[in-house]
Amino acid sequence: MSHTLGHRLRDGGFPAPAETRKTAVLIIGGGISGLSAAWRLANAAVDDFLVLEMEAEAGGNSRAGQSPLVAYPWGAHYLPLPTLESTSVRQLLAELKVLQGDPNATQPTYDERYLCATPQERVYRNGLWEEGLLPHRGIDAGERAQQQRFHELMDEFKQARGSDGRRAFAIPMALSSRDPLWRALDRIPFSQWLNANGFTAPSLHWLANYATRDDYGMAHSQTSAWAGLHYFACRNGEAANAASDAVLTAPEGNAWLMRGLAKRASGRIVTGAMVWRIEEGKANVVVDAVVDGKTVRFEA
């Protein structure tokens, strides 16, 4: 959100509604979540909906820019190979002709123009570059053994299932197992789980802390063990024509995905709409937004 809009929202004093628009469904925010909701409605043959987006273009942090030479992402820039549980993502990729053949196949074929081998990470430590995300120079045999055991256990957890038959750590997260034995991990910190399972190596705690800060914005001592393990064990998508750690991407990052979603909401996205009031009534929801300098009331 630009500072100008933020200050306008803070200052208040908006004019009374100049017009009222009615719709069956109103989606506030045209980021990936909002566009996904619109895509789902369109696929269900629901066409009476609107998307309100504050910026000049929908897409949130999946938008892209364009230089004279090449497009470039502003934020989100790759998609891991979708898991079997990610049926909606696979359906979208099939619509966009990036996933070829059966979208429910264990190892689908993907358009090679969107496939990218995972960039190999490296760490700058003590004035030297080291390959991989974990340091190995000057690490004793005991710490190296812990690193190997941790990676092996995460590979096991990628296939682990609960008593309900679901994967312990799935994407979408809501499809993960509800088995109490796995869910109990949500009640202890990730750092505590590591220590309790013999993972005391400083390099592993550094990696865990890096991971949780990157995805959740919190230290591994503030993140639940379930969430921390989900980071490492949720991705198990495969492809017939790529390694399992490959990703789907393009020069513009994830903008191609965003535009694929937005296409299904064509004509129903209201940009430059800053919502400043939401009121839930008995029969409907009333939303006031500034659009083109005037307040428009939306009723859904």
Locate predicted features.
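Active-site/ligand-binding neighborhood in enzyme catalytic cores
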Residues: G162-N284
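Core beta-strand elements of the Rossmann-like FAD/NAD(P) dinucleotide-binding domain
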Residues: R21-T23, G293-A300
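Extreme N-terminal leader/targeting segments of oxidoreductases
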Residues: M1-V25, N43-D48
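Dinucleotide-binding Rossmann-like beta1-alpha1 core, especially the glycine-rich loop
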Residues: V70-F157
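Glycine-rich FAD pyrophosphate-binding loop
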Residues: A42-P68
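Glycine-rich Rossmann-fold phosphate-binding loop(s) that bind the pyrophosphate
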Residues: G29-I32
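Short beta-strand segments that buttress and anchor functional surface loops
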Residues: V287-V291
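Short, solvent-exposed loop/turn and secondary-structure capping segments
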Residues: A38-W39, N61-A64, R90, L133-P135, ...
